[in-house]
């Protein structure tokens, strides 16, 4: 079952600020995620139904939430790994 993709308004602004190369890398991973969004190794324990996409080379993290009732993957936050910025933003936006 393929999930649809949605963005939190603040995450969409972050997406638009990204460089083209990073955006293309994340887009490629998001396409894979829409077919199988619940990858246990990428699950975030502190945030319910949330998972991460890591770009190791650039240090970016994308946090998404899986909503099974709507068959939707919602991008919650995109930011650098430094000081866990992406995870902190996601926690604030979901609380």
Which role fits each region the language model picked out?
Residues 2-4, 12-13, 55-61, 65-95:
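Enriched for short, Lys/Arg-rich terminal
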Residues 9-10, 29-32, 57-59:
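Short, functional N-terminal and low-complexity linear motifs
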Residues 17, 33, 65:
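Conserved catalytic core of Hanks-type protein kinase domains
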Residues 22, 26-29, 43, 83-93:
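Amphipathic alpha-helical interface surfaces
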Residues 31-55:
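A short, surface-exposed loop/turn module that caps and links secondary-structure elements
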Residues 27, 50-52, 78:
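Generic N-terminal leader/processing signal
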Residues 1-28:
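Arg/Lys-rich, positively charged N-terminal/basic patches that mediate binding to nucleic acids
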